[in-house]
């Protein structure tokens, strides 16, 4: 019997997170705060993206001890990041029993030409995308869940908005095309034809697509849900704020009740200072994490 997780099971696990918030944590204490706030899963890593950005150098998979401490601290699913194309980091995380692996541009890529063949793993994967071409290539490789790349560690929502709007606009374009136009569109996007055909018929991606990269306030989370996100990843925004526990609960509530503006106003009161943001135009080309991968 194959030890590879089936596509249906992997995608079903991602569907169970729909409508929720997944939070980056670096220790057991933060993981407990996230779970108590209502997070549907946590991402265990050594440093949040803002600290990875500030430190520079090569960012790698977290120490397995951190992953195990987080696993032992919570009952919700635990995710962890592997470098793009790093087969062994992914296998190590699979051996640790994580519930999901993020093949992440937040870490320094191990392979600038090839992403992981995620179909070969039992554990499901989440990957980032900026457009429908990237989205469908990752799905073809076996990704069971997508997220916008945004610009991690900046506290600036503008790139996540751009990526979510672009993917959804391209889905609408494909859905309106005749089948004889799809092959040319597949060529233009660098997208597998069969996946575009499925997207045309269904009018949506075959996997969930969360928002990530720059979510820093309850209003940011609600905005991404209104733009069509299936849920929200929050990296640096929570534990770089003045009051992480209160901030975490507020973002979870805003994600759930994303059209209740009165509630979002109440949730946004007296949260303290949000993380200090970065203007995207001030980043050098080599500092733009979203450019990693293809």
Swiss-Prot record:
UniProtKB keywords: Lyase, Pyridoxal phosphate, Schiff base
Positions that bind D-glyceraldehyde 3-phosphate: 165
Residues reported in the UniProt entry to bind D-ribose 5-phosphate: 24, 153, 214, 235-236
InterPro entries (alphabetical): Aldolase_TIM, PdxS/SNZ, PdxS/SNZ_N, RibuloseP-bd_barrel
UniProt superkingdom: Bacteria
Enzyme class, first EC level, given as a word: lyase
Pathway the protein takes part in: Cofactor biosynthesis; pyridoxal 5'-phosphate biosynthesis
Catalytic activity: aldehydo-D-ribose 5-phosphate + D-glyceraldehyde 3-phosphate + L-glutamine = pyridoxal 5'-phosphate + L-glutamate + phosphate + 3 H2O + H(+)
EC number: 4.3.3.6
Example GO BP: amino acid metabolic process
Keyword Calcium: no
Active site: 81 (schiff-base intermediate with d-ribose 5-phosphate)
GO molecular function: pyridoxal 5'-phosphate synthase (glutamine hydrolysing) activity
Protein task: Catalyzes the formation of pyridoxal 5'-phosphate from ribose 5-phosphate (RBP), glyceraldehyde 3-phosphate (G3P) and ammonia. The ammonia is provided by the PdxT subunit. Can also use ribulose 5-phosphate and dihydroxyacetone phosphate as substrates, resulting from enzyme-catalyzed isomerization of RBP and G3P, respectively.
Family: Belongs to the PdxS/SNZ family.
Subunit and interaction comment: In the presence of PdxT, forms a dodecamer of heterodimers.
PANTHER family membership: PYRIDOXAL 5'-PHOSPHATE SYNTHASE SUBUNIT SNZ1-RELATED
NCBIfam families: PRK04180.1, pyridoxal 5'-phosphate synthase lyase subunit PdxS
Entry protein name: Pyridoxal 5'-phosphate synthase subunit PdxS
Organism: Bacillus pumilus (strain SAFR-032)
Organism ancestry: Bacteria, Bacillati, Bacillota, Bacilli, Bacillales
Gene: pdxS
